[in-house]
Amino acid sequence: MEVHASALKHGIDADGAAQAAASPVYLSDLDEESPARQFRLGFDSSCRLLELVVLHFDSGRELVIHAMKARPKYLDLLP
């Protein structure tokens, strides 16, 4: 799991973003383009729920491009 510098602008560190993105509790495709954009919710090592946008390439490579503390409107998506 790679983390783009743009994903860090909301104060989430790269390790936390990668951990949350690698083990999502919610995942949804945002479009059918290539690379596919996926919206994910996951927890970092501090147990913060993060919202993430991850590019998923056909090769299997994944790149986090957005990471921030999850906004309340996404809590209903949790299982």
What are these regions (language model features)?
Residues 1-79:
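Ribonuclease/tRNase effector modules and their secretory precursors
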